[in-house]
Each structure stands twice: as C-alpha cells, then as structure tokens.
C-alpha cells in the first residue's frame, strides 16, 4: 500500500462524496480484487522486463473498471513507471485520430513526483543522466564544447533507442529544448515542450527556432510516442502504462468515426509488442466487446482478443480481464476500510455509531432496494455511506440506526438499465455490417 497522507485521505472522501473514483490513495480500500490486481501486476512485470503488451478490462456498469484502471496506474507508479489516464470522449477526444490520443496521453503523463504534465521533468531527468554519464566517462562539464557533446548524445541515444524511427522533427525539438534551457530561454523551451506534447497552439516563432513547421499529425503520432517511451525509460523509469477508459463511448459515435476508432484500437494492439516497456490498458463493457457495433464487428481484432469462458470459469491471463460486480461481503469490507480511514474529529463516536450492525443493515437495505443486485450501483452505496460518516462526525446526537433509512437516489440511465435487466444490445447492433479492416493512422 502506498503511504497515505492527510491530503490523500481528504481527496478520497471528497471524491466519493461526488460519486467519483479518487485519483490516488485508492489502494487503501481496494477489497476483494486481489486476483485481478495480481494479473495486472504480472502485466507490469512483463513491461518492466522489456515486453510491450496490451490488456483489456471487461465489466458491466458498476464493476469498477475505472477504479481498477486507476489502481493499476497507482501500482505502476509505485513500481517506478510513468503513467497516463485517458478517457474516451466523443467531444474532447476523437479516438480515430491518434494525434488526439497522443495529445491527451501527453497532457495526462505523470510520475510519482509529477502527477500531470510530466514531460518537461522527464526530459530534464534524461538530460541530467546524459550529463552525468559524460562526466563519469571523463568529460569536463565546464569545457566550452560540453553542451555540444550533450546535444550529440541526445541525437545518438534517440537514434539508438528508437532504432532510427524517431521523426527528425522530434529529435530537433528535443535538441532545441536543451539549447534554449542552456541559454536561459525557459519560455520558448516550454513552448516547444508543449508542441512535443501535441499542442496545436504553439507560436510560429518558437517552432522556427527548432526548424519545424506545422503540428504533429495523426500518422506521425505513433512514432512520436515511441520516442517519448524511450525517453521515459532513459530518464530512469521502468516503462510507461497508458489507460484508455470508457472505450464503450465509441459505440455512440457516428458509424464512420466508430469504424475508424475500432481500427485504431486494432492498430494499437498490432503495434503493442514493438513498444518495449509500454503497457496499454483499455476498459470497456461487454456490449463494446461482444456486439457487431463494437469489437465483434471487426474480425481481425475480435479474433485476437475474444473473451473465452467455460461455465463460470475464465482465465485471468487472456486478453480480456473480467471484472466482477460488487457483492455483499465486498461492500462490507470496503465500508469497514473507509470507516478506519475517515478523518473524524471523534473517532470513538464514528466507531460506535457506524457500527458493524449498521453497516450490515445498510448493505442489506441497499441490496433490497436494488432488487438484490447491489453490484450495479456501488457509487450510490459509497455516497450514502460517506454521508452517514459525515453526519455522525458533524452532529453529536445523530444516530444512523434510528434516524437513517435508505432510499435510492435518482438513477442514471445506465443504472436504470442495469437494474431493469434490459438488454443494451439493439437490433441495429445485431444487424450491423462488419467493420472494414483499414489502417487509419
């Protein structure tokens, strides 16, 4: 478990009050997922040993896909990886354009010391490692040509690490960032770091200093990602883990965008093995993986990652990792862990009022309120539970055993659908023509 600070604890409870998955500290109440977490640790070990790989997290609404993806990234950072968490959106992220995907990956790039927008820090660490290596080999860091030797090593190392596949503009920008920082021109160096991260709003004057025009294109972005990956490792990190959350959003896109997005996932899966030290995690619903509107409609991808299950048994090691819904024992365990973590003014009152009998009653009422299937709405349970912790903490005479009665809050369409048991698969999905197999980057 990572070291918990008071700031982390406050972040956890503020997020849960709003129905959100916390971005850190979640390993403190990760209960009942040891086997799935162990498989993701195995994937991290593969990446650390130099493998490139991709894993799909499969689960219905409320199964904890986002939680598991964020937990995997937290574990990855604790093991020395850089990470990035990207949410698929039909408004903000056009998944069929890899320059969009690359830009979001770079914006969300983080490490244990720099949680977001970490490319500048990673570059500094890599350049520092090069300077230290040159000094260790006998070079004089005060010599007039020392910076030129660093610049040449940047070029040589990028060519060696990427097998010559890093675009020349990528190399020139990295070298120019180094030059500008040595000159004290932090503003233009920062602008070029933004360009390297996929920004399309960098001034022409800054780009001119690196001898580049235009922006990173969709067809170039995969090669840029290869360069970034190698710099991440050269900076001392074990590798890079990228989580793509809510891939089922692709199902709501226009047909042409949906087809291109599915082919984009296929291209990522096809290329994954050649990106040594990179682990992709992609979350999605069974509908996304199993219908002809989704992965099942694109035969080359479906054949590679099709979910295999015999009765109630499924291997954790196959391409799709199945996440199971919450059950009553798991809810009780999570509630007890949250009670332990809660930053109460009077911990004894919390333990006395939010008792084991009250937790058991709340779990039972929630389960009954949702037709015996609490697994579809853990968000509601956790919000209700944290609210009871707050009520006891704030009001000395409040007793939840006598004052509180569970009433389901307004449900989202996804929750209504999950509880009703209605199939999400539409006639259109069943009649969907096969997705054309094409390279779109």
Residue ranges and their predicted role:
Residues 39, 71-75, 97-108, 260-264, ...:
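Alpha-helical scaffold elements adjacent to nucleotide-binding pockets in ATP/GTP-utilizing enzyme cores
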């Amino acid at each position: 478990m990572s070291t918990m600070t008071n700031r982390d604890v406050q972040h956890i409870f503020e997020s849960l009050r709003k129905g959100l998955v916390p971005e850190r500290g979640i390993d403190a109440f990760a209960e009942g997922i040891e086997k799935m977490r162990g498989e993701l640790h195995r994937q991290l070990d593969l990446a650390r040993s130099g493998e490139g790989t991709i894993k799909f997290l499969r689960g219905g609404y409320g199964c904890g896909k986002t939680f598991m993806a964020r937990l995997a990234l937290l574990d990855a950072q604790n093991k020395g990886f850089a990470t990035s968490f990207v949410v698929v959106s039909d408004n903000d992220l056009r998944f069929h354009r890899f320059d969009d995907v690359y830009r979001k990956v770079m914006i969300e790039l983080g490490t244990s010391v720099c949680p977001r927008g970490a490319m500048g820090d990673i570059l500094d660490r890599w350049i520092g490692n090069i300077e230290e290596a040159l000094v260790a080999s006998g070079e004089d860091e005060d010599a007039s040509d020392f910076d030129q030797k660093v610049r040449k090593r940047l070029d040589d190392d990028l060519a060696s690490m990427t097998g010559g596949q890093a675009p020349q503009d990528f190399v020139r920008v990295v070298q120019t960032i180094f030059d500008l920082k040595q000159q004290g021109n932090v503003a233009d160096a920062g602008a070029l770091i933004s360009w390297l991260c996929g920004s399309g709003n960098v001034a022409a004057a800054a780009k001119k200093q690196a001898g580049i025009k235009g922006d990173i294109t969709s067809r170039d972005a995969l090669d840029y990602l290869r360069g970034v990956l190698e710099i991440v490792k050269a900076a001392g990190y074990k590798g890079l883990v990228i989580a793509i959350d809510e891939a089922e959003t692709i199902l709501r896109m226009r047909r042409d965008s949906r087809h291109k997005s599915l082919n984009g996932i296929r291209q990522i899966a096809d290329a994954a093995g050649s990106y040594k030290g990179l682990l992709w995690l992609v979350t999605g619903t069974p509908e996304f993986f199993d219908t002809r509107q989704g992965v099942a409609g694109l035969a080359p991808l479906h054949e590679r990652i099709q979910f295999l299950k015999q009765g109630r048994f499924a291997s954790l090691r196959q391409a799709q990792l199945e996440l199971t819904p919450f059950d009553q024992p798991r809810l009780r365990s999570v509630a007890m862990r949250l009670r332990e973590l809660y930053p109460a003014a009077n911990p004894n009152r919390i333990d006395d009022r939010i008792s084991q009998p009250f937790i058991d009653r709340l779990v039972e009422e929630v389960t009954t309120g949702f037709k015996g299937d609490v697994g579809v709405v853990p968000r509601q349970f956790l919000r209700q539970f944290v609210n009871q912790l707050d009520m006891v903490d704030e009001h000395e005479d409040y007793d939840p055993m006598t004052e509180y009665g569970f009433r389901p809050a307004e449900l989202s369409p996804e929750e209504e659908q999950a509880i009703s048991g209605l199939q999400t698969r539409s006639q259109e999905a069943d009649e969907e023509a096969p997705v054309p197999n094409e390279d779109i980057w």
